[in-house]
Amino acid sequence: METFVRLFKDSPQQRSNAWHATRRTQVGGSDLASVLGLNPYKSYYITLAEKANLFKKNLNHAACNWGTLFERVSKDLLELFCQTTVIGDNIHIDGTYLGYPGHSNSPDGFCYLTLGYTQQSWEIKTIFNDVCYETTKRIPVLVEIKSPFNRKIKNSVPSYYVPQIQSGLALSPPISMAIYVEAMFRVCGIHQLGWNNETNTDIHPPESMLPLAWGIITICSTQEYTEAPQDFGTLNAETFHQFLETLYQKDQYTIHYSTPYETACPEMSNVVGYFGWKVFIFQIIPVMKHPQFLKDKYPIIQQFLHDLHTIQTSPSPMEAYEKICCTKESPLSTEDIDDFTNMLT
């Protein structure tokens, strides 16, 4: 696993300008469900328009930023709960090296997990498992992390995330299993941190259970900042959403994470504010590799890349886009047209 990750040490770092530029010309793992028509939130056509830069601007949703914000926390908790170390969480795997040019995957990382065998089955060993296993084994896995803002967490992988996971497995030959990590985080004021169910109930409904862990996220300005820090965990829902919308814009802030179970704010310079978090659900679902998945789906990726190239090289990209939409077997839906009208020039 370590040798495989080192192969991509010089790849564009995730969320860097080079990474964004590269992904605009490729079908990434997170694009795949949309390209395959499996994403209920974004279609083939909207993804095509997005890649062709036909939007007025890149959309920046609070829910997406929420997921990005808590990805690091989920990795810290995974390492703690499973006694492991996540590596390769910043690499970009270009599928060209395996014969899939134009396709890529940016994994949330790789780690070793301990599997314990008992009662004729294997399970993932965590610090919460008080079980005496008949035998154990350590295996390398791909990590995929999601932290939904509102969506109810179920004990299964949502169908529209399966292509992203299988893409990562297909482009990682040494790995035969992935884990889908899904966590439910809630925001709280610093004074609410600890072994209790207190949260900001203006942002999310109250929780009846106790948290698995908690901690602090600190936001610092990249410029000199001398005002008193604000407890963002006490904001009302509308203001907190606005805060999330601007968090990753124009490199205004740096984000710092406490270790789990911390309750004291760190001593730092240029602190704009901070907020507490609590995690109430943290589930780890194993996903086995389907060896033929990418081979079977790659023709659709190639068609998408062909459509994208047609638009980008056309003297009239909008006309080329509209022609593609009208000639496909599944034309734009009413919902797509509404979204299209709002987002395109």
UniProtKB/Swiss-Prot annotation:
Q: Which UniProt keywords apply?
A: Host cytoplasm, Host-virus interaction, Inhibition of host NF-kappa-B by virus
Q: InterPro entries from the xrefs?
A: NF-kappa-B_Signaling_Reg (IPR051703), PDDEXK-like_dom_sf (IPR011604), Restrct_endonuc-II-like (IPR011335), YqaJ_viral_recombinase (IPR019080)
Q: Which GO terms describe its cellular component?
A: host cell cytoplasm
Question: Where does the sequence pass through the membrane?
Answer: none
Q: What does the entry give for GO biological process?
A: symbiont-mediated suppression of host NF-kappaB cascade
Question: Chief location of this protein?
Answer: host cell
Provenance organism = African swine fever virus (isolate Pig/Kenya/KEN-50/1950) (ASFV)
Q: What is this protein called?
A: Protein D345L
* Similarity section: Belongs to the asfivirus D345L family.
Q: Quaternary arrangement and interactors, per the entry?
A: Interacts with IKKA/CHUK and IKBKB.
Q: Superkingdom, according to UniProt?
A: Viruses
Reported function? Plays a role in the negative regulation of host NF-kappa-B signaling pathway. Mechanistically, recruits IKKA/CHUK and IKBKB to suppress their kinase activity towards NFKBIA.
Compartment(s): Host cytoplasm
